[in-house]
Amino acid sequence: EIYKGQYFSKYKKSRAKKVMVFDLDETLGSFVDLEILWSLIERYTKSFHINFDELLDIFPEFLRYGILSILEYIANKKKNGECYKLFVYTNNQCGKKWTERIINYLNNKITSDFRLFDQIVNAFKINNVKIELNRTTHKKTYDDFINCTILPKTTTIFFVDDVSYKDMKKERIYYIKPMPYKHPLSTNEIINRFIYSKYGIILLPRDCTRYAFKAEYIELCMKNGTYHLYTNTTKTMLENDILISQKLMYHIKEYFLLTNKQNKTCKRKSVSFSFTRKRNN
């Protein structure tokens, strides 16, 4: 689903600030099973520290296919001054620290020269406790976003969320709603990959502790409704994930082209959307 505000109906020379806004869950990636695993690990770790970034590196499938290439493109736009800021606008219910861990991972993964994501707009409430003071509702709205970020209302916004919010469909918003991203890993594949990683070997040195840890993780996934018996991937699903990321990159490039203050003609430039997936070894 694509929504372009009236502002983007034609090419124009614009000095308005351009910002990018991403939802977290099922947009940047699929992180529910990772949160369950991390919570369990924290209960087991006593005498040593597990690096969260290194843990997530074990599971590159938790990130949406192609998202690192997309974020690298945005980082270059920030570096050359075309993109003013990059935000996360989330309703994640696991707390600020959890969201910060994922965003810090992405910051560290993309660039060490500057902070890629400028601000996280967190959930309105978690367990009925108000978290983001300048939000007024759990729904995502343009007014709440502006109040939280203190951006001028002349700002143009490229917004990506796998959920449709009618109050984010405004004149200066270019809104992309991709299909929700679901990682393809089975529950057994997740837990076995961790158990036999360098951290798993240290944390769970004996067969009995490995068995107990695995059983507890599976039970938590079942309670949470995220237990997957089989690996959920096919050639068609992979092709669909690739296509979604290609289309997302295309629309991001078009967004900058439509609002480029250097563009002095209305001649349409070709927009390439090829990319290669960044793999973690």
PLM region spans:
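Alpha-helical substrate-recognition element adjacent to the catalytic core
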Residues: E1-N128
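C-terminal cap/substrate-recognition subdomain and adjoining C-terminal extension
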Residues: G95-R279
